[in-house]
């Protein structure tokens, strides 16, 4: 097209696989690459007008800002969930929520209680947003390297875990499968890495904290750490959870909750479905047809999990995916050349390693799926005391959700409802 003046400014050339089931030469090695069916590479020419929208309009900007504000609210609600089993937090929250100013003046005690409540919510809310920003920066840096434009992120609020992630769309066609792969995997890779670092650093702060500091940390049942194989192995290096009863409470630094939630959000986004990061990686490595088959199997697995004892998180996530991210993404301009001929095995290894990390996090020691936070205990629940006299493990009191906080406590069951224990 370069030989014709002005042609390259009006037309875009694509190299795409055309799948055929008959009349193919089986000796042609190129037609068996990366798919279950045979294909022939064909050139396709499109007008440059047939392209994704390359700039955000006012409506998109307003919608994106609204998503950001809503996500900020749900992250604060999730912060309330995370702290809901800490007696001190509940007492302060009740004081701040129930106080009525006399003569238009709020007491100093009430103001102090409100400040303490907010100070415990801020690390969780902004920690979650920070990890998501790191995830999105991974996409943007890779897109910049490959001269590809992507949209501003549209954040997905969640009442279960604060934030499900974000949606980023391609605003120009990726140049190749390699570009698609690098852009897609860079977000989850950065998100997994920083979430893991936050979890480990939070555990270090937990171990080194004084008893007074621990009293201000979120409390979760020790059995929570067995809800994920990967999480159990990491936490067991720092806390003596293997010697504690599952229903005893463990106090953890807020960064642990933030890191674990970040791992979950990145794992969900790396599922190989449609326009999710995992779906884009699958399409870059295996082609569109293979990616569609993998997505179908994954969707069936997600649907089955809805009827199991898995977290309701997966129900809300699959609904979002089906309505927003189910369809295949736009193709790269070169959709035939492998991800990288000389680095093909390394690219595949990175993809499988990330998928294995996702599976290790999502599968628990008991066969159920991972949950981010425990369900607030009811007044009839009797918790077993911890057997280990460590400061980070404490007997659980009977904690009931307060009426003023009940709308905010949207946690989901951990593994199963705790059985009453006679003490």
Q: PLM ranges: what are they?
A:
Residues 1-423:
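Hydrophobic transmembrane alpha-helices and their immediate loop junctions
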